[in-house]
Regions:
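Structural detector for short beta-strands of small beta-barrel domains
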Residues: 12-23
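Helix-rich effector regions associated with P-loop NTPase G domains
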Residues: 8-13, 48-53, 57-62, 69-93, ...
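Beta-strand/loop nucleic-acid-binding surfaces
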Residues: 35-50
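Canonical P-loop GTPase G-domain recognition
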Residues: 131-188
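Phosphate-binding glycine-rich loops and their immediate beta-loop-alpha structural context
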Residues: 98-150
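Walker A/P-loop
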Residues: 191
């Protein structure tokens, strides 16, 4: 259990730390010796995110963030009409969906595009493998994503349920020595997964919420959990399965972020083909030949229009 530090002796020396929770502009920082304290940003633009490595200075009420170290990557989510970063320095993203209730393919596609844009490896976890018929239907729905090279991991996340232990063993191998952000809509089993992987997670979440003054049952905090005592593997939990921030992406970049579309762009007659109406379009030809899912192509058109409108403002 972390050692909480409400206040430290004032010191002019900078200290290293890891941001393990955030709520608004307040963050919880884990120090190099395992202590935790509340830190506040210095200035409006010095906003730290969960996963950030920072340099902080002790103050009377905790610490102030003096420097955010260079980030390997950033993941974004949507905030009204803007894209807003919410996690940094990830090795992979685990997108958890379930056989029931039926998942939104649009939300899944957006999450994958956000990961591709940030150069973060995505994994898809398909939960409720114990529901044979719905699971078979959901697995078929994910076949285009397997064809794109995305790994789909079957899971049965049910405390004490048949297949749960073997599911977790296989997943733990994927999480080993990595920082993984886990995302999923309501009903996908994200809370169950976290509680199975991290005994005492609920109590720790309550302590963090109290420390950040957000209330014990907050749903707005992004939280970092260590998966092992050696602190080599970590899981980041972010609330909900919100629309992913894609408005920072230029429309012309979109085909390269959708592997099934990108595969066929080299066959287009025109270098600036939008893949919507031009003659000699390799992407449209691939749709007609059944090499690209019609639903995926439809989503490409919808998102291209959305990004084109967003980039006008």
């Amino acid at each position: 259990m972390p050692c909480w530090v409400p206040a430290l002796t004032l010191s002019p020396e900078l200290n290293s730390g890891l941001v393990v929770a955030s709520h608004g502009r307040h963050v919880l920082v884990e120090t190099s010796d395992g202590r935790r304290l509340i830190c506040h940003p210095r200035g409006k633009k010095n906003t730290a995110l969960v996963g950030d490595r920072i340099q902080w200075l002790a103050t009377g009420d905790g610490g102030s963030i003096e420097k955010i170290e260079a980030r390997r990557n950033l993941l974004y989510r949507q905030d009204e009409i803007r894209s807003k970063s919410f996690a940094a320095n990830l090795d992979q993203v685990l997108i958890l969906v379930a056989a029931e209730p039926e998942f939104s393919e649009s939300q899944l596609a957006r999450a994958l595009i956000a990961a591709e844009a940030a150069h973060i490896a995505p994994l898809i976890g398909l939960n409720k493998s114990d529901l044979s018929e719905p699971f078979a239907h959901a697995s078929l729905k994910l076949e285009p994503y397997r064809c794109m090279g995305y790994e789909v991991i079957p899971l049965a996340l049910k405390p004490g349920g048949a297949g749960t232990e073997s599911s977790l063993d296989g997943l733990k191998d994927k999480l080993h020595n990595k920082v993984t952000l886990v995302l999923g809509p309501s009903g996908a089993g994200k809370s169950t997964l976290i509680n199975l992987l991290i005994p005492g997670a609920q109590a720790l979440t309550g302590e963090i919420s109290t420390a950040l003054n957000t209330g014990r049952h907050t749903t707005t905090s992004t939280l970092w959990y260590w998966l092992d005592d050696s602190h080599h593997s970590a899981l980041i939990d972010s609330p909900g399965f919100q629309e992913f921030g894609l408005h920072h992406i230029e429309p012309v970049q979109l085909p390269a972020l959708m592997p099934d579309i990108q595969t066929h762009t080299g066959n287009c007659r025109f270098y600036n083909c939008t893949h919507l109406h031009e003659p000699g379009c390799g992407v449209r030809a691939a749709v007609e030949l059944g090499h690209i899912s019609p639903r995926r192509y439809e989503f490409y058109g919808e998102l291209l229009q959305e990004l084109s409108q967003a980039n006008r403002y």
